[in-house]
């Protein structure tokens, strides 16, 4: 304060309040108002110095002087608060104007994703069999050689066991591999579930094929397995016909041709006749099937003289390819939007 006495009269205090009000009213933005607050309400402002000077006022006058100083400071503070509210409202209004969205402008169309056609097919197959009373079963993609080959009646020297056909997992001798088919789920299911069993398994499989128009090293299979008392090839044929009609239309029908698979006896390949989505009708090889081999049942602890079963397996990529007239299987894995658009992806 120095040696200069502070005037605590009502006139002096009123002048300090008036100066603060005028200064706050001139503030054009919040930054300017903040600077003026320091000048008029800060620790070195006239009203702050007036409060500090109360200690030098005679005791009999100090109470009245204190009330005057506090009232003046409250008036200045009120003027500041009112101007602060005004400037904040102006700022918010300006932001709303600057950031407003013109709803009359044409919108930018955002592409909408969808499920991959293989996923759509897999879900449709699952729904078809669930509606028939079957259940879903799953198994690991990294499989034990025991389940992939041994328990499925593959001889030790079968060519499918070679590294030219199968991806083995390091270290050598681990007897772990990437499953070459979904058939290992058959054995796992028979070991884990009570009979009778009616299950399908849908999943990825792996083989050392080169990627070309009709092959891919990673592909999807659907595997069906039924084990019960008294099952025959007639039950298998009926199941295949129902499956074909669900996927290819009510006119579809199947036929079977003798073949060999280690895990079924008798074994057959399945052909399906249908009217294609791009026109034309005819027979196409679809997959493999047969009655579950007695050795597979024995490996799961099931008496083949009491129970019998049938199994079938189809590739989803192949099914989608010939059902929809897709010339090149690589289109399914390369993510080209031009290919995916007809199925709803990116539409």
From Swiss-Prot:
Cofactor names: Mg(2+)
Reaction(s) the record says it catalyses: tRNA(Phe) + L-phenylalanine + ATP = L-phenylalanyl-tRNA(Phe) + AMP + diphosphate + H(+)
InterPro entries: aa-tRNA-synth_II (IPR006195), aa-tRNA-synth_II/BPL/LPL (IPR045864), Phe-tRNA-synth_IIc_asu (IPR004529), Phe-tRNA_ligase_II_N (IPR004188), Phe_tRNA_ligase_alpha1_bac (IPR022911), Phenylalanyl-tRNA_Synthase (IPR002319), tRNA-bd_arm (IPR010978)
Chief location bin: cytoplasm
Protein's cellular compartments: Cytoplasm
Gene3D superfamilies from the UniProt entry: Bira Bifunctional Protein, Domain 2
Protein origin, superkingdom: Bacteria
Subunit field text: Tetramer of two alpha and two beta subunits.
HAMAP family: Phe_tRNA_synth_alpha1 (MF_00281)
Protein name: Phenylalanine--tRNA ligase alpha subunit
Species name: Mycolicibacterium paratuberculosis (strain ATCC BAA-968 / K-10) (Mycobacterium paratuberculosis)
Gene, per the UniProt record: pheS
